[in-house]
Amino acid sequence: MAKNIQAIRGMNDYLPGETAIWQRIEGTLKNVLGSYGYSEIRLPIVEQTPLFKRAIGEVTDVVEKEMYTFEDRNGDSLTLRPEGTAGCVRAGIEHGLLYNQEQRLWYIGPMFRHERPQKGRYRQFHQLGAEVFGLQGPDIDAELIMLTARWWRALGIAEHVSLELNSIGSLEARANYRDALVAFLEQHQETLDEDCKRRMYTNPLRVLDSKNPDVQALLNDAPALGDYLDDDSREHFAGLCKLLDAAGIAYTVNQRLVRGLDYYNRTVFEWVTNSLGSQGTVCAGGRYDGLVEQLGGRATPAVGFAMGLERLVLLVQAVNPEFIASPVVDIYLVAAGAQTQSAAMTLAERLRDEMPGVKLMTNHGGGNFKKQFARADKWGARIALVLGESEVADGTVVVKDLRSGEQTAVAQDSVAAHLRTLLG
């Protein structure tokens, strides 16, 4: 007997019972994006490796440890995308979307990182991201955060997420801070673990989000990034905070928040939760005004964010279980009798024409009424339509509300209107 082939570790199947809630959550997210004027862009999952090295930074954990990189038959180095911003910028440059234009784009799809699989974090994971190009003021940063806050309200999780903000300043301000931080860390190398010692010279800002408690205690005495901000960045951040205050969005300024990718400048933010065990990030982003030029385009201000959908689904299920998936079907058509199958299928097609979007399933495979009603329950149907030989003969159909048990005979010509009333 041949050995079963199983899914790769950290790359999951999502079965019909799970995908229904994914679809409802994704639908909510997409509706909000549309209400803010964002358009979808669809991007390849494989890109040239230099794209990510240039965008993310060669000494980041993502590039050094986590990317799935391989050579194709032509000897070109390709990588499964570990994040979406770099590909979105590449597409914007390649297709001329960014030159002297404002763009508001969103994307959704699988990303890939070779890291240890754990709850809510997998090697293939799904991400929704939004990017804005051509706007440089704090007002668009604030609107992006307002958009995400609207998501949390729509999903019923607003009380379970909190916003952390920081400004990491301009490239020049960050370079000055980097020198001060390295000088401080050099004086306390005995407290640093090996990972922090390596990062101290390659990417010292990443030491700030070390999970090592000894390092975290040491950083209480480290220079503060906020003390090194340039005047423009201070003004930008103050403007952002003022707009969020006016919108009633609570936040905490976290001066250790730096994000893990090299392309960020000025605004960075994270929405975090404590409702999944240890604190976890639900959504994160910031401003990256230099990335378009870095990847070969003209200098273009940009800001965006990304969100891991696996963690979001877990959070919604944990704190708002009433946000249940829509039923697989609204209506199940039960047919019994040798002469009813053709009439049932004809009625089903007519109802699909008259009720666009209705989820209607016709029974196939025979079975008595008891078995067919059991199938209707299995598929989560709200209403059963019962068509027997007598109903076919007199042009009626029995409409049964499977929640209340009430049923009534309705003329087939008017059943669509009756169903609309029942389904609301």
From Swiss-Prot:
It comes from Salmonella typhimurium (strain LT2 / SGSC1412 / ATCC 700720). This is Histidine--tRNA ligase. The keyword Nucleotide-binding applies. Coiled coil: none annotated. Pfam families: HGTP_anticodon, tRNA-synt_His. Belongs to the class-II aminoacyl-tRNA synthetase family. The gene is hisS. Homodimer. Its EC number is 6.1.1.21. HAMAP family: His_tRNA_synth. NCBIfam families: hisS.
